[in-house]
Amino acid sequence: MKFLCIYKPSKPEGTPPTQQDMAVMGKFIEESMKSGKLLATEGCLPSAMGARIRRSGEKFSVVDGPFSESKELIGGFALIRTDSKAEAIEFTKSFLQIAGDGETEIRQIFE
């Protein structure tokens, strides 16, 4: 089973991780890639560099960042492979132990 994990940190946007945090996360990523559970992962740049595109009927609207709602800010994503939703949840808990406070939404990918 594949899952898309979307991470929304509680920290204010643009708060950089410490060198130690980066090292611990780097080790977690390396081990997770080797095990085959982590397929891809990347962090996102600040929302000021992004945009939201919406379609309603035949009209499109574009709103440039930054976005003010902190609960809507995406810090990064991961694509993981696990044997079950329960295993994906446990993997995500391990990630959050390192990343810190925040929320990760997991969505199973249609295969």
Question: Where do the protein language model's features map onto the residues?
Answer:
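Conserved, structured core segments of small domains
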Residues: 1-111
